């Protein structure tokens, strides 16, 4: 058994501001680029392939994303922590993790074979896609272990570089295949290629510094799985919550309905760039106040909650207004049912933006256990909601995807209410409810101002008109405190400064000595 004496462990290196800035900038650039590429694919892929093929691809991804969490078994979090504490054991830890993942992937294949045999209709294309995406999952879970290790070594810039490269490969190859007339099977192979590129790229940067030891240490593997299982529950709960709707729609409605739902959710997902980007810029600065004591929680929580309220309401209600014409424009008549699903997801978006902030606050306030209970409850609630709403909307509206969206709305609203209730007392105050009411009124005014455009050929004018009306009403109502407006201005300045090329051009020139 391999072990290290604690006295040989080198002292941790001092915190480097330059390293933190480099990692944050790399993550920001990678997020922006991958978001842009995902957006391009989300537009062209459904229109060219059609709802049936998109549904088949979505089902395959949903199955393996759930199984992938079981294969990972929470080891990513364990690896990051273990490597950060004992970098000299990187080779042993990585080698053990990779071998364990391969073994768990083989077990996962047996489980998927059973599901494919009994739960999925005898469709050769669907079966082929399931196993192609299964191969992609193998490379993805192996790459995930390497990424976790690089994160532990504080080499996030390598992770960002490889992420952008693999997404670029996926985007270019997928679009080339789509425009050349290849079917969904080839799109599945494009995902395999991108996952392989990611694995090889991560391996290149990691293995040149730390060679893995492929001889598995059973004691180390047992310890790794035992410690990692505490992270598995949260990850599995979240993944089941995110993916189970598609499998229920396939079971109670049709594969085409899965395509309608998956297309709407993918487009909705591209809008999640904003809370992640804002969290990257603002939240770390605000959470530093937690170190001063629990009483400073409200000082950090209230401004960012107000800001996310002010941002989520116009985007969410704007999506409600123009979802149907946007879906028709982007995807064509075959995806008309996607429009109403996307409109419902506009309401979900408001809740999800706020839930993103609340989950960060709960973790910062040492309420992780409460957050886990909320997510488990939401996942459990999703099952009967899907079982009731999907067949009902399929029967009444001929759109089972709508039932999945309604279930999603109910659970996200439930998470929002529960998360607010379990925050430490006084975290949110009367000022937050005032901001919520006034920004809600501004959003309602915006919705009334642009609703008539949804049936117009010029529906796209709803975006600038809605923005002007909303901003004008927010300022007129004095909905946001002056301090929050200052934070928004500073955040936008930091965001622009971190963007490649743009920030460099806007940086003022240094005066010559």
Go through each PLM region and give its residues.
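Specific pore-lining/lateral-gate transmembrane helices of multi-pass inner-membrane transport
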Residues: 82-100, 260-376
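N-terminal membrane topogenesis motif
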Residues: 1-37, 88-91, 95, 126, ...
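Small-residue-rich midsections of specific transmembrane alpha-helices
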Residues: 31, 37-41, 58-84, 137-144, ...
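Signature of the first transmembrane helix
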Residues: 3-4, 16-76, 109, 113-116, ...
């Amino acid at each position: 058994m391999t072990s290290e004496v604690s006295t040989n462990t080198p002292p941790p290196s001092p915190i480097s501001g330059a390293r933190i800035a480099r990692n944050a900038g790399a993550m920001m650039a990678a997020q922006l680029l991958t978001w842009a590429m995902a957006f391009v694919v989300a537009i062209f892929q459904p229109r060219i392939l059609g709802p049936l093929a998109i549904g088949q691809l979505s089902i395959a991804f949903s199955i393996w994303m759930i199984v992938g969490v079981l294969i990972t078994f929470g080891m990513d979090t364990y690896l990051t922590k273990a490597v950060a504490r004992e970098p000299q054991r990187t080779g042993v830890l990585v080698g053990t993790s990779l071998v364990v993942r391969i073994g768990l992937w083989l077990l996962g294949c047996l489980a998927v074979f059973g599901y494919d045999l009994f739960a999925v209709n005898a469709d050769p294309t669907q079966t082929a896609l399931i196993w192609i995406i299964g191969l992609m999952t193998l490379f993805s879970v192996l790459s995930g272990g390497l990424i976790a290790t690089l994160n532990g070594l504080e080499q996030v810039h390598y992770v960002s570089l490889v992420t952008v490269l693999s997404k670029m490969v996926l985007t270019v190859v997928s679009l080339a295949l789509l425009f050349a007339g290849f079917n969904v099977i080839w799109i599945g192979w494009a995902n395999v290629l991108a996952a392989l590129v990611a694995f090889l790229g991560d391996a290149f940067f990691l293995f040149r510094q730390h060679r893995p030891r492929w001889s598995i240490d059973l004691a180390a593997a047992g310890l790794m799985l035992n410690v990692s299982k505490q992270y598995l529950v949260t990850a599995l709960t979240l993944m089941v919550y995110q993916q189970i709707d598609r499998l229920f729609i396939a079971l109670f409605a049709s594969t085409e309905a899965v395509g309608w739902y998956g297309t709407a959710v993918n487009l909705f997902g591209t809008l999640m760039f904003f809370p992640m980007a804002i969290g990257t810029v603002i939240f770390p600065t605000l959470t530093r106040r937690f170190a001063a004591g629990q009483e400073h929680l409200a000082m950090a929580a209230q401004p960012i909650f107000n800001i996310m309220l002010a941002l989520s309401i116009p985007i969410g209600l704007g999506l409600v207004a123009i979802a149907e014409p946007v879906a028709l424009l982007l995807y064509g008549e075959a995806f008309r049912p996607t429009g109403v699903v996307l409109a419902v997801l506009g309401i979900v978006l408001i809740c999800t933006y706020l839930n993103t902030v609340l989950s960060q606050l709960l973790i910062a306030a040492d309420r992780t256990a409460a957050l886990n209970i909320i997510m488990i409850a939401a996942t459990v609630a999703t099952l009967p909601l899907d079982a009731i709403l999907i067949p009902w909307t399929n029967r009444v509206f001929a759109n089972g995807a709508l039932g999945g969206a309604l279930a999603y709305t109910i659970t996200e609203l439930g998470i929002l209410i529960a998360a607010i209730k379990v925050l430490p007392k006084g975290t949110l105050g009367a000022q937050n409810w005032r901001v919520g009411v006034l920004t809600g009124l501004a959003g309602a005014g915006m919705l009334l101002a642009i609703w008539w455009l949804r049936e117009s050929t010029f529906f796209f004018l709803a975006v600038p008109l809605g923005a002007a009306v909303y901003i004008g009403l927010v300022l007129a109502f004095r909905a946001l405190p002056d301090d929050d407006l200052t934070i928004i201005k500073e955040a936008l300045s930091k965001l622009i400064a971190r963007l490649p090329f743009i920030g460099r051009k806007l940086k003022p020139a240094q005066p010559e000595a």
